[in-house]
Amino acid sequence: MAKRDYYEVLGVNLNATEAEVKKAFRRLAMKYHPDRNPGDKDAEVKFKEAREAYEVLCDSRKRASYDQFGHAGVEQTFGGAGAGGFGFGDLGDIFGDIFGDIFGGARGGQAREQRGADLAYELVLSLEEAVHGLSRTIKVPTWINCKTCNGSGAKGSSPATCPRCNGSGQMRMQHGFLQVQQTCSVCRGRGQVIKDPCTDCHGQGRQQQTKTLSVKIPPGIDTGDRIRLAGEGEAGLFGAPPGDLYVQVRVKPHPLFHREGNDLHSEVPIDFTTAALGGEMEIPTLDGSVRLTIPPETQGGKQFRLRGKGVKALRSGAVGDLICHIVVETPVKLSPEQKDYLKQFAELLKKDEKNHSPRTRNWFDSVKDFFTSK
């Protein structure tokens, strides 16, 4: 039986934050944990499935591999055994693993590092930049490791083991039949205390700074696409690993083209004489101009497809087309002389209207039949 998508298992979207993933798993763990459903095999399977999904989506490296390769990208992590590779643990251990400050942080009696927060940055591009790709320098306000104490929070000394929890970061408490772990109130889950805080970062191990980064934009990117820069988010507290930076792309509207997938669309206005008699015209594309032949008797709404003049697909490399939508423009602000010529021309057309304006004639015939049948 094929494995379900991890995001589907937890009921979160692809952009879910770590906090949202934890919240979703907590809800499922409370519902399906075997301690709450003794003897229920279906609940046991669902709990294992949820825990496996949580273990992957809350680990930035595993999640990146899963997002790129699917289950195959993390199979080695679980030895191909699926969710069966996980133990249940008691509810206290689970909550301690998920909810840090509430239930104590890490498993196995070790303090859990507080990873830095992920950051989001909106990058606005022109259509040309999105289609052709480029490198763009961005400036991101963030937290970086303190250079004075190298992120430890202690200047000129090392942090000491917490005397309250003996370095575990947690205090185990008994609540009825449940045994839960609570964060140590002295070290706040770190397992260490700082006796001589760094004066530059006030013992946090990090400082605020605007970071300058170069972002490589691949050709074919579009609005809604996201670029992940691993480790470029906020620095963690007390030397903990940094978060990631997600660059969210938004492409500005273009005066000539609008994009649909890998195809570009453009309205091409022509005068009514060119529509009737035909002609040639220069058509702009994102790679220069091309000549388009307008055949005689071209009607408004006619589409011409210029193959290979669209966008190169971001992943497959296939190239879309440029689709030109013909708009026949009615002349305006005519002089009296021009109006006279048009009236004479109209009279000439009426002599053989069925041949010159078949759609108009057919439309009037249909209208006549419609009212006659009433």
UniProtKB/Swiss-Prot annotation:
One of its GO terms (cellular component) is cytoplasm. It comes from the Bacteria. The J domain is necessary and sufficient to stimulate DnaK ATPase activity. Zinc center 1 plays an important role in the autonomous, DnaK-independent chaperone activity of DnaJ. Zinc center 2 is essential for interaction with DnaK and for DnaJ activity. This is Chaperone protein DnaJ. A zinc finger (CR-type) spans 133-210. Homodimer. It holds the Pfam family DnaJ_CXXCXGXG. PANTHER family: CHAPERONE PROTEIN DNAJ (PTHR43096:SF48), DNAJ HOMOLOG 1, MITOCHONDRIAL-RELATED (PTHR43096). Participates actively in the response to hyperosmotic and heat shock by preventing the aggregation of stress-denatured proteins and by disaggregating proteins, also in an autonomous, DnaK-independent fashion. Unfolded proteins bind initially to DnaJ; upon interaction with the DnaJ-bound protein, DnaK hydrolyzes its bound ATP, resulting in the formation of a stable complex. GrpE releases ADP from DnaK; ATP binding to DnaK triggers the release of the substrate protein, thus completing the reaction cycle. Its main location: cytoplasm. CXXCXGXG motif repeats lie at residues 146-153, 162-169, 184-191, 198-205. SUPFAM superfamilies: Chaperone J-domain (SSF46565), DnaJ/Hsp40 cysteine-rich domain (SSF57938), HSP40/DnaJ peptide-binding domain (SSF49493). The keyword Zinc applies. The lineage of its organism: Bacteria, Pseudomonadati, Pseudomonadota, Gammaproteobacteria, Legionellales. Residues 5-70 form the J domain.
